Amino acid sequence: MIRRGDVYLADLSPVQGSEQGGVRPVVIIQNDTGNKYSPTVIVAAITGRINKAKIPTHVEIEKKKYKLDKDSVILLEQIRTLDKKRLKEKLTFLSESKMIEVDNALDISLGLNNFDHHKS
């Protein structure tokens, strides 16, 4: 079963513009009820092109700890919904402490804790 925090290889093509594409690792960020019953999953792209977080929506993951080819960064500003058929092989899963970092970066990316544009 697909679980929140799992890292899979996924085919993200086709893409447009600045979207992350190709076959690459992604982390499942959807809740486990959705993962069980929905034909789709919500994921965040992972890149190995940078190995240090550049902005607050980035989370670093270490290659040795997570059995990746290289030190990588989860891009929580690059989230998308995929059909489960796009998921290839499961690579690993993230620790609870790493998922707390993911949740904090998601909060920033989605503006969940500072919704104030209706204030006058």
From Swiss-Prot:
GO biological process: mRNA catabolic process; rRNA catabolic process
UniProt GO MF annotations: DNA binding; RNA binding; RNA endonuclease activity
UniProt key word Nuclease: yes
Gene3D superfamilies membership: 2.30.30.110
E.C. no: 3.1.-.-
InterPro entries according to UniProt: PemK-like (IPR003477), Plasmid_toxin/cell-grow_inhib (IPR011067)
A Pfam family reported for this protein in Swiss-Prot or TrEMBL: PemK_toxin
Signal sequence residues: none
Group of enzyme by EC: hydrolase
Entry keywords, A to Z: Endonuclease, Hydrolase, Nuclease, RNA-binding, Toxin-antitoxin system
Sequence similarity: Belongs to the PemK/MazF family.
Task performed by this protein: Toxic component of a type II toxin-antitoxin (TA) system. Ribosome-independent, sequence-specific endoribonuclease that cleaves mRNA, thus inhibiting protein synthesis and inducing bacterial stasis. It cuts between the first and nucleotides of 5'-UACAU-3' in single-stranded RNA. Neutralized by coexpression with cognate antitoxin MazE.
Quaternary assembly: Forms a complex with MazE which is no longer active as an endoribonuclease.
UniProt name for this protein: Endoribonuclease MazF
Species of origin: Staphylococcus epidermidis (strain ATCC 35984 / DSM 28319 / BCRC 17069 / CCUG 31568 / BM 3577 / RP62A)
Lineage, broadest ranks: Bacteria, Bacillati, Bacillota, Bacilli, Bacillales
Gene (UniProt): mazF
